[in-house]
């Protein structure tokens, strides 16, 4: 039995799932929006919110945690520079998931996750 299933498994082993979420988080912060499956979009939403909350904190420890998670060092510095101005008055909910048409090959539910 799976009591307290907090993390969607996304059909992958733990190491591949963590790498996928890190890559999607990095790409979403870089480009502002990413088209992916609905399950992946919902899973990456909490990771993106966590990174933006760290950036709003702005401390050295928060910066080091973000550098340890995201793949692009320059992107982390840019996020920390603009997060307070862009998200200063918002208490969470930094991204939205918009459903789109299903994927043609396997009929998977697709979504666009974008930063607010």
Swiss-Prot record:
Gene3D superfamilies attached to this UniProt entry: Ribosomal protein L17
Keywords, in A-Z order: Ribonucleoprotein, Ribosomal protein
InterPro entries: Ribosomal_bL17, Ribosomal_bL17_sf
Lineage top rank: taxon: Bacteria
CC terms in the record's Gene Ontology section: cytosolic large ribosomal subunit
GO molecular function: structural constituent of ribosome
Gene Ontology biological process terms in this record: translation
Quaternary organization: Part of the 50S ribosomal subunit. Contacts protein L32.
Similarity section: Belongs to the bacterial ribosomal protein bL17 family.
Designated name of the protein: Large ribosomal subunit protein bL17
UniProt gene name: rplQ
